UniProtKB/Swiss-Prot annotation:
Molecular function in Gene Ontology: cysteine-type deubiquitinase activity
Protein name: Ubiquitin carboxyl-terminal hydrolase 17-like protein 10
Comp. bias regions, Basic residues: 510-524
Family: Belongs to the peptidase C19 family. USP17 subfamily.
Subcellular location: Nucleus; Endoplasmic reticulum
Ranges of Basic and acidic residues composition bias in the record: 382-392, 398-410
Region (Disordered): 382-410, 477-530
Organism (species): Homo sapiens (Human)
Gene3D superfamilies per UniProt: Cysteine proteinases
InterPro entries named in the record: Papain-like_cys_pep_sf, Peptidase_C19, Peptidase_C19_UCH, USP_CS, USP_dom
Length: 530
């Protein structure tokens, strides 16, 4: 069930949206995705839902429609490397994966949002637009990511790359909503971010006594895959959509026959995203131990077997980015990424170093997060690049492909980021801090019967939760070259309370990886014993 393209005939097509209706007029979509701020849905899992092709009218259409000029289209070659500012490899790896996401990058280069944005300060879409535009148009250089990109998240310690990635995506989603409280939830699903990353789960329960069917639909922005018993991404997806029998103590209370009866429950993808973010759950529990086994993933992935509607032809996705964590546990390690430039060449992005790679090398990594895009989307964006390529002062073809950005930096001095307005960091921190985001997430998320990411965990009673991250950062000496921090926002040393409440970027040493678990339903806490 392949949707219309985001980009057709030189025009943006963010207006087509796969839609659902319910036999109940008050049915709505439960915002349960762990990377968004959920709102409780009145849609009952005991309500029979009929599917059709159209959704109830939305109050506002929030996606762009304009046609981008040729000069705004992205260059075909790889862009700049990113300077590690002290424990920020997780930021750099995540930003590189977002930068080379064709629908998002092309939209950012068009600069439509910043032309109409009224926030001016603290807007993640404007901040990402500036970063992506800068990174893609100065290949061969090394740049410093803006401090505002991690304001409210980075605390001078190594954080989880996937968590930062989805924190950023959610901040961009909010930036698409002018006047959050005045926008209905159906309109929220028409935003640029949701139409690029968003899809819907369909949980169907069939009563084996009366054969009544109940459907529940829940949005997602990423898909978490349990890899403990899987040897490949395809096996993990098969396990995810495998039918489950409900009987005995777990029998289903049917809303049709009003009896407690055996039932079958099936979870499928009703609407698949333009861009798939697949998270391999390598840190599944509170111990911090990493599942370090190799999990095979293909260059081309057919998602049709996991869709609600079958026999509609292949739904092929192509791999364009891989986020990698190197290390044996959550307590140490390093993040890097592999991205596919629009020219078709793969590159390894390791902070400031950018080196050409091959698909063979890419597919042999211990992947943490995989990024796939619908094949038709990739081909259309590649074609637009070949038609509208901009001249470049320095391209990858002008240098030895084996050279790293670190080597190029000697000939092309590192571009320093402009001084950041203190009010920008302060406002961004106040509007979207990590603790506040997670607190609202835990308070507001719904508890549907199907919970594909549940991992039980407990917190000892004799600890004080200071920061919602599972593990303390353990400083190592594996990277002495980073012992001198490059990022120092304040000459004063904050108190413990100030460190807890502010999201300012503090300077710490090393690239040591701090532990993280991947289940968003269990609390992530940095614990200090009382």
């Amino acid at each position: 069930m392949e949707d219309d393209s985001l980009y057709l005939g030189g025009e943006w097509q963010f207006n087509h949206f796969s839609k659902l209706t319910s036999s109940r007029p008050d049915a709505a979509f439960a915002e349960i995705q762990r990377t968004s701020l959920p709102e409780k849905s009145p849609l009952s899992c005991e309500t029979r839902v009929d599917l059709c092709d159209d959704l109830a009218p939305v109050a506002r259409q929030l996606a762009p429609r304009e046609k981008p000029p040729l000069s705004s289209r992205r260059p075909a070659a790889v862009g700049a490397g990113l300077q590690n500012m002290g424990n920020t490899c997780y930021v750099n790896a995540s930003l590189q994966c977002l930068t080379y996401k064709p629908p998002l990058a092309n939209y950012m280069l068009f600069r439509e949002h910043s032309q109409t944005c009224h926030r001016h300060k603290g807007c993640m879409l404007c901040t990402m637009q500036a970063h992506i535009t800068r990174a893609l148009h100065i290949p061969g250089h090394v740049i410093q990511p803006s401090q505002a990109l991690a304001a409210g998240f980075h605390r001078g310690k190594q954080e989880d790359a996937h968590e930062f990635l989805m924190f950023t995506v959610d901040a961009m989603r909010k930036a698409c909503l002018p006047g959050h409280k005045q926008v209905d939830r159906h309109s929220k699903d028409t935003t640029l971010i949701h139409q690029i990353f968003g899809g819907y789960w369909r949980s169907q329960i069939k009563c084996l006594h009366c054969h009544g069917i109940s459907d529940t639909f829940d949005p997602y922005l990423d898909i978490a895959l349990d890899i403990q018993a899987a040897q490949s991404v395809q096996q993990a997806l098969e396990q995810l959509v495998k039918p489950e029998e409900l009987n005995g103590e777990n029998a289903y209370h049917c809303g049709v026959c009003l009896q407690r009866a055996p039932a079958s429950k099936t979870l499928t993808l009703h609407n698949s995203a333009k861009v798939l973010i697949l998270v391999l759950k390598r840190f599944p529990d509170v111990t911090g131990n990493k599942i370090a086994k190799n999990v095979q993933y293909p260059e081309c992935l057919d998602m049709q077997p996991y869709m609600s509607q079958q026999n509609t032809g292949p739904l092929v996705y192509v791999l364009y980015a891989v986020l990698v964590h190197a290390g044996w546990s959550c307590h140490n390690g390093h993040y890097s990424s592999y991205v596919k430039a629009q020219e078709g060449q793969w590159y390894k992005m390791d902070d400031a170093e950018v080196t050409a790679s091959s698909i063979t090398s890419v597919l042999s990594q211990q992947a943490y997060v995989l990024f796939y895009i619908q094949k038709s989307e990739w081909e259309r964006h590649s074609e637009s690049v070949s038609r509208g390529r901009e001249p470049r002062a320095l391209g990858v073809e002008d240098t030895d492909r084996r050279a790293t950005q670190g080597e190029l930096k000697r000939d092309h001095p590192c571009l320093q980021a402009p001084e950041l307005d203190e009010h920008l960091v302060e406002r961004a921190t106040q509007e979207s801090t990590l603790d506040h985001w997670k607190f609202l997430q835990e308070q507001n998320k719904t508890k549907p019967e199907f919970n594909v990411r549940r991992v039980e965990g407990t917190v000892p009673p004799d600890v004080l939760v200071i920061h919602q991250s599972k593990y303390k950062c353990r400083m190592k000496n594996h990277h002495p070259e980073q012992q001198s921090s490059l990022l120092n926002l304040s000459s004063t040393t904050p108190t413990d309370q100030e460190s807890m409440n502010t999201g300012t970027l503090a300077s710490l040493r090393g690239r040591t990886r701090r532990s993280k678990g991947k289940n968003k339903h269990s609390k992530r806490a940095l614990l200090v014993c009382q």
